[in-house]
Amino acid sequence: MRTLWIVAVWLVGVEGNLYQFGKMIKNKTGKPAMFSYSAYGCYCGWGGQGKPQDPSDRCCFLHDCCYTRVNNCSPKMTLYSYRFENGDIICGDNDPCRKAVCECDREAAICLGENVNTYDEKYRFYSSSYCTEEESEKC
């Protein structure tokens, strides 16, 4: 059920921030975000609970924390401007909310790229029923 919800959100949100975030992830990891990270581990995808399963999942945990800090900006749907330049992601918005959301996505994409070697297929489409351990850290 979680996977269907995530796919539905991705399809509805292709014009919004989730599409932009997906492009950043693809740029940094070489992996298509929707198929590789939309239901990965305990934190990649919609929602999250428990303990991150590996460094890639921890990137998503940190991304969730960042979104919590900018929650008043509607981070999952806020459009922002950015560009790829010499392998870097440059957030280019003067609006504080848009800039903050872009920076959350940028940092997560960089983190996923730096940890792409930890990606483990066993955590792809991981059931949230396995995410019952207490969080290892707080935001």
UniProtKB/Swiss-Prot annotation:
Main location: secreted
Enzyme active site: 63, 105
Subcellular location: Secreted
Textual note on the cofactor: Binds 1 Ca(2+) ion.
Signal peptide region: 1-16
Tissues showing expression: Expressed by the venom gland.
Top EC class, one word: hydrolase
The keyword tRNA processing belongs to this UniProt entry's keyword annotation: no
Transmembrane segments: none
EC number annotated for this UniProt entry: 3.1.1.4
Pfam family, one: Phospholip_A2_1
Domain of life: Eukaryota
Disulfide cross-links: 42-131, 44-60, 59-111, 65-139, 66-104, 73-97, 91-102
GO molecular function per UniProt: calcium ion binding; calcium-dependent phospholipase A2 activity; phospholipid binding
GO CC aspect terms: extracellular region
UniProt keyword annotations, A-Z: Calcium, Disulfide bond, Hydrolase, Lipid degradation, Lipid metabolism, Metal-binding, Secreted, Signal
Residues engaged in binding Ca(2+): 43, 45, 47, 64
Job of this protein: PLA2 catalyzes the calcium-dependent hydrolysis of the 2-acyl groups in 3-sn-phosphoglycerides.
Protein name: Acidic phospholipase A2 4
Organism: Echis carinatus sochureki (Saw-scaled viper)
